[in-house]
Amino acid sequence: ETLTLEQVLRAIILRSANEASNGVAEYVDGSVEAFAKHMTERAKELGCTNTNFVNANGLFDENHYTTAHDMALIARELLKHEEYRSMMSETDYEIPPTNLQTETRYLHGQHQMLNPNSIYYYKDAIGGKTGYTVEAGNTLVTYAERDGLTLIVVVMKCNGAEHYTDTAALFDYGFANYASVKIAAVSDYTSTVPVTETYNKKAVALGKVTIAPSEDVYY
């Protein structure tokens, strides 16, 4: 079957399509094994110190592991890329007929904190990914925004609906006790300095250069 990469990524994000994950791995790196190695290397670049991938879909393997902190680092990197940030916020997607499917397929997301009709809906949640295996229980990565502050919550080894209720409790605590504060404004650190060149012990003015940070700094 022929699908676009964007369609396959939606199948992975919304429906945890394991075969789609394997397909992407083979497309990108030639094999699942090579892709898993690639993922592990990239995770280390992001600062992950307790993560090792051996497959592309997250199914159980004793040598396939991570931590809540490492998953948060990976999620933080994803948020920097608008195209993936947008995909993670979607709750529904349609895949039109393909060379092997004659009917449109409708994908509905499983993350209940993004679903306005769910009792677990969290109005500030703007994206995330569910996960489940027998060994790991329910796992959940979610990010939410309020008043300019973005928080990422990762929960693991949850039973029943604990992954939703625990995530909501952590968000409530975070938004109640933390705020995004501007610690440096571009205007405060902008300076115009003269540029000169010395020739035969004489300074010649060449002009002026304005130096400033690229953006305000928040903490």
Q: What residues fall within each predicted segment?
A:
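Domain-terminus/edge residues, biased toward the C-terminal soluble/receptor-binding domains
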Residues: C48-T49, N63-Y65, H69-Y219
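Active-site-adjacent loops and short helices of periplasmic peptidoglycan-processing enzymes
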Residues: E1-H69, L73-E82
